[in-house]
Amino acid sequence: MSDCNSGGGERRPNARATDAPPVRAPSGGAFRCRGCGACVILIAKYNPKTDEVTEFNASSCLTLLYSIHFCSIITTEGLGNTKDGFHAIQKRMSGFHASQCGFCTPGMCMSIFSSLVNADKSKKPDPPKGFSKLSVSEAERSFSGNMCRCTGYRPIVDACKSFASDVDLEDLGLNIFWKKGDKHPDPTKLPSYTLGGGICTFPDFLKSEIKSSIDFNDASISSPREGWYCPKNIKQYYKLVNSGLFSESSVKVVVGNTSTGVYKDQDLYDKYIDIAGIPELSAIVRKDKGIEIGAATSISRTIEILNQESESTSSPNGSVVFRKLAEHMSKVASPFVRNTASIGGNIILAHKYPFRSDIATILLGAAATVNLQVSSKTLHVTLEQFLEQPPLGHNTLLLSIFIPHWASDCKKEHTLVFETYRAAPRPLGNAVSYVNSAFLGHVSLDKSSGDNILSNLHLAFGAYGTEHAIRARKVEEYLTGKILSASVVLEAIRLLRETIVPVEGTTHPEYRVSVAVGFLFSFLSPLCKGVIEPGKTLSISEDLVHTDNVHNMPLSSRRETLSGDEYKPVGDPIKKYKVELQASGEAIYVDDIPAPKNCLYGEFIYSTQPLANVKSIKFKPSLASKKILTVVSAKDIPTGGRNIGSTFLFGDEEPLFGDPIAEFAGQALGVVIAETQRYADMAAKQAVVEYTTDGLKAPILTVEQAVQNNSYFQVPPERAPKQVGDFSKGMAEADHKIMSEEVKLASQYYFYMETQTALAIPDEDNTMTVYSSSQFPELAQNVISKCLGIPFNNVRVITRRAGGGFGGKAVRSLHIATAAALCAHTLRRPVRMYLNRNTDMIMVGGRHPMKARYSVGFKSDGKITALHLDLLINAGISADASPVIPGTIISGLKKYNWGALSFDVKLCKTNNTSKSVMRAPGDTQGSFIAEAIIEHVAAILSLDANTVRQKNFHTYDSLVLFYPDSAGESSTYTLHSIFDRLASTSRYLQRVESIKKFNSTNKWRKRGISSVPLIFKVEPRPAPGRVSVLNDGSIVVEVGGVELGQGLWTKVQQMTAFALGQLWPKGCEGLLDRIRVLQSDTLNLIQGGLTAGSTTSESSCAATLQACNMLIERLKPVMERLQLQSDTVSWDTLISQASQENINLSASAYWVPEQDSNFYLNYGAGTSEVEVDLLTGAITIIRSDLIYDCGKSLNPAVDLGQIEGSFIQGIGFFIYEEHQTNSDGLVISNSTWDYKIPSVDTIPKQFNAEVLNTGYHKHRVLSSKASGEPAVVLGASVHCAVREAIRAARIEFAGNNGSGSSLLTFQLDVPAPMTVVKELCGLDIVEKYLEDLSNRGAASGN
């Protein structure tokens, strides 16, 4: 069995599962998606021959348990923990406010630790004390594969950069170690760091065991029934394969097992052959003509070898190939995947599947060959020949890859050129390419003309919609020997278009071909006289670092906050409550709760059809099917219960199971029960559902179909938004009109890091305890009790914390909790359900997609006189919370004074997954629609969009007209001052001019800038609170709200200290440490309500304050009596005396906001500048500036983190995140492979955020304001800036073909990913440019 040092101590796993389960760390790691990095661990391997230890980080969910035999495993708990003390990484992550929900934090810590350990091993000079050898640029890349949905990454970057030897401490963001603005921050105040990480990564006991087992030659490290085989050489491998022990269907050959991150296992395997230990497959052989790399060599190791080879190769011609290959490979996958994925495995995937491999393409461009072992024969074939072969069986091994030097083949008069390209959503990797290519050739000069001639060309293209990478041989043949000119390049591109033909069904086919054309143009243009080279910037904004590539700009930020003193410690930017536990992995989420005895596991079987009768559910014969214990379905609902999976505020319900009709693709049909979660997951994949549509109408999938079928949900009158003014009169006053224009907004998936999960434990007297990752435990209790037919007081729902929510765990979590409870009730055994990422994305829904059609009238100066909006909202199959969405959309729209506003909003019922609330629901879409209209008006009038925006800002009087119940007093209307301040601090006008200059001198890159205002209506909800003082003076606080990462517990802790501090002898010093905030428990504190809308923190604080005030009233008389005896009365003395006097030391309150008077508006604004690559559509966010009115912030550090994270999530919605479904409405962008949230390399290069502390307000909780949701709206500033850049591109390449109006006005829907951006910039701009050059050349006689 494997020995591992997990969590700092010796642990010996005793797994016997025949399917070789992934590593599951005792704590500090989690896995359900195979792509987010939350489960990253450090693996250390010991070589007894060299006495060397190699450390690397890896994704534990991809790492098979038996593959770490004789390895040492370090989780974040092994770095530091409560018992042994926390590591400097954990302390700095905590101190830089770099953890919110905390679910991703263990993986972040381990990625940073791995980078520090490996950097400190380098030959760089020793850094100053307390720092590492890591550089700032390396620090920024150290966690490029780790995803975070909460923070927006900036504080994580700061925490990591704090270790860098070249960091400027003044550039680091808000932290607890020094005050922001200190001219000379003291590095000694940072938690101490020891060079090398300060952790023993490989224990002596394990070294001894390894040394004693060197002569162990058996091919199996475990008993035959465990089925894990490790051949020590190729001969042993073939002996195993030919032994008759294996069948092709049940054996899996593995090296790193990372392929399962892309092509998920469809069944269990009963036998594995691990070939990573075969020396021949990891051998590195340097030859005269090149280098041979063993197929089992990791991609990371391959990069190291290539870099070494590029430095050692004598000829610069030869070194360029290895250097470029290494650079490109560093953008493949993520660091922790590259560490275990083998280069040969990547090529095998490219051979076996239509896998969009970068590595296969670039090696093909470098003319690599491969060595194969077929039984007793060794074959040498070109990579091109290998990729074209039929699939290989286990009797064929890929031995090695040979990459030629090229230097020896290059004549003196020739220059070797080699370039690689990729177009992908993320510049640093962790995203598959839309297109990739690699070009190699020899360049010589024509003696007569001095022009360049190409020879020995290799032009490789891949990922464009082909089975495998290819060489464009017709293009190679055409270009060989020709003098390069614009006309020659143009003809080559025409030939390329004939060659690069995506197969039917390829997404974005025209885009992929266009980008391939752009890559070839980028390669050839520097070799052509008179052709503008895409790769260089000709001028640059004064605001920017001077660089030819904005992708390489260093990340920087300015984070400004003001703290108030009147309510201390409320208002202080203290670190998050118990944040170190999140960093150390000790924070307990639902799946971390130890499985009770006899626990079973469940996974949903879901429909793949949108409207069909379910005739039967059967299972394919397979290993996984044999693991099924039972299937729980609607027939198992007990007498007195009912088929209910969720209920809503407006009386509607959604069934738990589709029975007998599946109403939408993704609807649960039953739950497979097995003894492990992996067994259950795999078994569910074996389900074969038979459907029939007899007697059923066609499904309604689109809003247009809903209109045709009159399929709508009703909006309660009290929730219906109110129109303003007389639309007809306003249109009559207009000088100009835009009639019936359209804009569409797609859905967005929540992508909380912790997927939906619940643990249900049946108890005596027909009771049930359910641990649920939920934003609405109270409603979960309601639905579970109705499903089981038992009273509410028989159901206890507990939520300690959730690993993110964003609205997705409000209503959509109820199905999982209810299903787990039903299974546990039926089987009388505990049942755990933890959805994998694919199932979660398919079943849970997301933000509401919609289509808006608007008509608007306006004056010549940009003043809008009237707006009418027709809005179709796709709500999905059930009402959920959708009836609130029309009101919030219109509320977001009303941020401008439209003069008169009318609308027709239809809430469409369709056969899709139910859409629910998601961060700033409705407001996000409504605000964007407003911006689209403003920008359209500005384009028609050829005015700066900000001029039109400000022209239509509300006066206080119009604000009251549009927001009659929440406008507040005139002194609280701060939008005008915020927008003016933002224009000044962001240098908006100066940058507009700089961008004009940039765009006029750069043909292939364009920039845009835009500002977006924010008005966001907030409606606080009631909340309970209880404060209890124990006899030792310690304090426990209970609130109904759930800690999701938004800092609720932190603010409640601060509020408790502020209130009880009146009786604390030394202000509040030391009081915070005496306060513990407890988990949500529906039988302990009732009426907990919904945690959503960014108001639960303040509502919980209000309830806590009321409860504290009750205690103070009881304790003050005791204090006064004690003060007669002594001037100073300690807290402990006070509590002891009160206890003796039988004073009730527990107080409960239920805070209810006053109707309307507690409603208020949030204000803010954001400015963003972007650069667009016209050849790929890639977007780089150069800079974003935010200013946000937070009232009197309860905790500026928490609020700033919420604002930044919310803004980045907004960027994801508006730009990056493509929510795609098939023709049946089934979600197909259902994994980290297909769905890309923002990552550290796609956030703004410069990110400045300022939190304003504005004045006193009697109706708000200590004058505070919400922070978690509103800033999503400001992400639209990036979308609007992209529109400006596209507009500049369209003007650049218009020629004589387009009118001014068609160039300036165009529909840019949401999201606007690089594929859409490129299409709008032009799919044929390279050809247009070359045609123009060729025509001009012909006219001049050249």
Swiss-Prot record:
Organism, as annotated: Oryza sativa subsp. japonica (Rice)
Similarity field: Belongs to the xanthine dehydrogenase family.
A molecular function (GO) term: oxidoreductase activity
Residue ranges occupied by any FAD-binding PCMH-type domain in the UniProt entry: 221-408
InterPro entries found in the cross-reference section: 2Fe-2S-bd (IPR002888), 2Fe-2S-bd_dom_sf (IPR036884), 2Fe-2S_ferredoxin-like_sf (IPR036010), Ald_Oxase/Xan_DH_a/b (IPR000674), Ald_Oxase/Xan_DH_a/b_sf (IPR036856), Ald_Oxase/xanthine_DH-like (IPR016208), AldOxase/xan_DH_MoCoBD1 (IPR008274), AldOxase/xan_DH_MoCoBD2 (IPR046867)
PANTHER family named in the record: ALDEHYDE OXIDASE-LIKE PROTEIN-RELATED, XANTHINE DEHYDROGENASE
Region annotation Disordered: where it falls in the sequence: 1-23
PROSITE patterns per the UniProt record, alphabetical: FAD_PCMH (PS51387)
Protein's name according to its UniProt entry: Putative aldehyde oxidase-like protein
